Amino acid sequence: MARSLAALLLLLVAAAGASHAASPAEMYWKIALPTSPMPGAIRDLISPASSAASASKDKEDTVGSVFFLEKDLFPGSKMTLHFTRATAGAALLPRGRADSVPFASEKLPEILSQLSIPAGSPTADAMRSTLAVCEAARIASETAPKHKHYCATSLESMVELVASSLGTRDVHAVSTEVVNRAGPTPRQAYRVEAVRPVPVPGGDMVACHRMPYAYAVFGVHGIKGAAYTVTLAGADGTMAEAVAACHGDVDGHGVAVAEAYKRLGVAPGKVAVCHFLPQDDMLWVRN
């Protein structure tokens, strides 16, 4: 399988040279997921100039921090949301390059040296935190297989983790997109214009969350529940096609979700709690 993929990649490289310069990520996607459209979260990493919206330093001021109940998601409902992006400039590395850079806390000085990042800088501190989270998640996944959570440092490793979790490569991904505004969007009221269920066979999904790092790193974990694509109209005319994930498996998904259950007045595991995915995150499901 690996040899056939390599051969196909060489053919695509030759074809790209005759027409346009396709990126390694685009070529890999065409081979690995030929029938699945590339989500905006990946497209924007390939063309970072198109994702120059500002990032929020406050996790409580992002679209992903707003939790609600499934019954409250209907045309005409209103929510105050803030669509933000991860720090600009984080590249999506090809697997070969990503694998050549260590990814371990004990190797952080070497990592910073390879990537020319000053020790003690905000970026270095964020990387230290992400490495610690990824290492803790890996250990927890080994002791509690029900809540597997891994970190992917390349598109190839992400797709393999997703395929392993869902039991097939016949998958596709969806992500949130602000469709008519390239720059930063303010925190404002949005009206729900339309709600469309995402087909989720067996209720099995895999979420991929961008993590703060010098290059694109995703936290990958499985969830069980429902998903929707939601058309949102902002007070200033901003339009968004947002992905909402609704799930009740609060265990292993952090304090924020547990706090959401308290605010919404429901018991953990009894009722699904929903949240929108930030633009940098993705949700994968079987076709």
Curated annotation (Swiss-Prot):
Name recorded for this polypeptide: BURP domain-containing protein 2
User: Which SMART domains does this one have?
Assistant: BURP
Its lineage reads: Eukaryota, Viridiplantae, Streptophyta, Embryophyta, Tracheophyta
| Cited PROSITE patterns | BURP
| Claim: Signal is one of the keywords in the record | yes
BURP domain residues are: 67-287
**Cross-referenced InterPro entries:** BURP (IPR044816), BURP_dom (IPR004873)
* Pfam families noted in UniProt: BURP
* Disulphide bond pairs: none
The record's keywords, sorted A to Z, are: Signal
According to UniProt, the tissues expressing it are described as: Expressed in shoot.
Q: Any signal peptide, and if so, which residues? A: 1-21
